[in-house]
């Protein structure tokens, strides 16, 4: 099975919200609800990973900024 390319955070969040709405409606057959739930769990994991990556990038940028030498601006 081909692996689905990683979505951006916003798309992942939109898809997750859609699944939650379907599950909350309560009109899905059990097997479909379980499949949707499984997909939602994977999306949550992807979202968490994207947030962790963003947090790491921010930390790197802040650390670089703290180590930079101050210079007069002309």
Curated annotation (Swiss-Prot):
It comes from the Bacteria. One of its GO terms (cellular component) is cytosol. InterPro entries: Exonuc_VII_S, Exonuc_VII_ssu_sf. GO terms for biological process: DNA catabolic process. It catalyses: Exonucleolytic cleavage in either 5'- to 3'- or 3'- to 5'-direction to yield nucleoside 5'-phosphates. Keywords: Cytoplasm, Exonuclease, Hydrolase, Nuclease. SUPFAM superfamilies: XseB-like (SSF116842). Heterooligomer composed of large and small subunits. This is Exodeoxyribonuclease 7 small subunit.
């Amino acid at each position: 099975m081909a692996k689905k390319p990683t979505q951006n955070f916003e798309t992942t969040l939109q898809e997750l919200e859609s699944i939650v709405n379907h599950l909350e409606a309560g009109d899905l057959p059990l097997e479909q609800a379980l499949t949707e739930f499984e997909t939602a769990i994977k999306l949550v994991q992807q979202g968490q990973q994207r947030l962790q990556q963003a947090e790491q990038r921010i930390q790197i940028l802040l650390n670089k900024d703290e180590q930079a030498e101050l210079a007069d601006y002309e």
